[in-house]
């Protein structure tokens, strides 16, 4: 895992824990909290501009095969980025700019959700509580 990707992962974990703290007070169970956190709006897309560029450049020319083979949350994330790309590329300041340039701004836009399953949120929550947000997966 590269340093850049890990900083995104740590930031995502921080944001998940923050949202969990806000949402857990109104939930009747932890499972309900995990579900609500997973569908809660996120402050950004947790993907690097390079990764977004690699997937979106194929989608722009009509090749959705790589994205369609992904897990459901990841697929939703890239389709959401693609829809946002269509809107953002029509803005005056982005007309005529390269996809690579646009992706740098696109991934920092607010995301409609965290694009994680409730099980993943639970895993992250438990690991963060036990080891802190900087734990490394041994997968």
Please place each PLM-identified region on the residue numbering.
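Acidic, proline/glycine-rich low-complexity IDRs
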Residues: 121-139
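Short, basic interhelical loop/turn and adjoining N-cap
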Residues: 38-55, 104-127
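Basic, amphipathic alpha-helix used for nucleic-acid engagement in HTH/winged-helix/SANT-Myb modules
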Residues: 1-24, 30, 35-95, 135-139
């Amino acid at each position: 895992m590269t340093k850049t990707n890990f900083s995104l992962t740590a930031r995502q974990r921080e944001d998940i824990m923050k949202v969990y703290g806000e949402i857990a007070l109104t939930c009747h169970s932890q499972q309900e909290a995990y579900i609500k956190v997973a569908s809660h709006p996120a402050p950004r897309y947790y993907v690097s501009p390079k990764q977004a560029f690699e997937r979106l450049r194929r989608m722009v020319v009509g090749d959705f095969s790589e994205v369609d083979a992904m897990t459901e949350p990841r697929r939703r994330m890239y389709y959401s980025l693609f829809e946002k790309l269509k809107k953002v590329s029509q803005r005056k300041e982005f007309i005529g700019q390269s996809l690579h340039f646009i992706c740098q701004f696109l991934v920092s836009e607010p995301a409609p959700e965290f694009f994680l399953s409730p099980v993943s949120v639970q895993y992250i929550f438990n690991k963060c509580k036990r080891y802190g947000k900087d734990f490394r997966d041994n997968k």
